[in-house]
Amino acid sequence: MTRKPLLIFLLTLFLTALQVQWAGPADGHDAGTVSLLSPEVLGAYPGVLLLFLLAVFARRHMPLLRQAAICTGLLAVYWLLANYVTFDARVASWSTYTPLEIWTHVLPASVISIAACGAAFFCASWLILRETRWNKRG
């Protein structure tokens, strides 16, 4: 395995865990229902998806900025859905929230964390992808 996919995967795991914990409710709600090792928090699902997409993009010779932008957009959507699941498990399960009410809580809480982690992922993944010294040597 080359270093680029491994670095992208580890970056995805780290930033997903950071983003979901940052955006999650932390004030007196049941934090035990969603652990740090739960699938939506850990980020293994988007990590595998992004590795597959990057392999497809590489075969199509897509520009690196476009690759990083598409992967960042998909990851941001995943993070928003993970925040929804986390809020639903920690807060909404103890009360009667409609899906619209959950979204009104999740969207404002997610904007800053998704923007910051998305910018970090975009820049880091673009730098990783454009680096040629990490290419597999035959």
Where are these regions (language model features)?
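Alpha-helical transmembrane segments
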Residues: 3-19
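Alpha-helical membrane-associated segments of multi-pass integral membrane proteins
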Residues: 5, 92-137
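Alpha-helical transmembrane segments of multi-pass membrane proteins, especially transporters
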Residues: 8, 36-40, 70-75
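Hydrophobic core of alpha-helical transmembrane segments in multi-pass integral membrane proteins
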Residues: 13-17, 51-52, 73-77, 117-124
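Interfacial non-cytosolic loop connecting adjacent transmembrane helices
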Residues: 24-44, 80-110
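Membrane-interfacial segments
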Residues: 26-27, 62, 85, 89-90, ...
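Canonical alpha-helical transmembrane segments
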Residues: 42-65, 69
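Hydrophobic alpha-helical membrane segments
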Residues: 47, 66-91, 113-116
